[in-house]
């Protein structure tokens, strides 16, 4: 009778352990799904933000170019226009299909993705703001 009791208790322990392992696997898969959803949200916000920045910047560049394209430009204004065109190419190069974006971000945690996105923002927005400031300063000097 002791042997039957030991076998029954062992079976109960083994089945409880199997259930806990199964529950752990389910919770891990649920966490993976939640992480994927969070990554998609982060990417969506980033795309919308960059899209807005690109649209605004393109409109500004077109207005700036239309005002100064047909007039005489100084060497400094020519350099500013070349830099603006280079920045526009950089902004266009950030457009990736979603699959490539998922491949790049797979394996990163959310903090690493946010840091990478912030670095890209700083790399692009810093020179853009400087060039726009210089261009506006030059226009104000000419007007004033």
Curated annotation (Swiss-Prot):
The modification Tyrosine amide is found at residue 70. Keywords: Amidation, Amphibian defense peptide, Antibiotic, Antimicrobial, Cleavage on pair of basic residues, Cytolysis, Fungicide, Hemolysis, Secreted, Signal. InterPro entries: Bombinin. One of its GO terms (biological process) is defense response to fungus. Its main location: secreted. Belongs to the bombinin family. This is Maximins 9/H3.
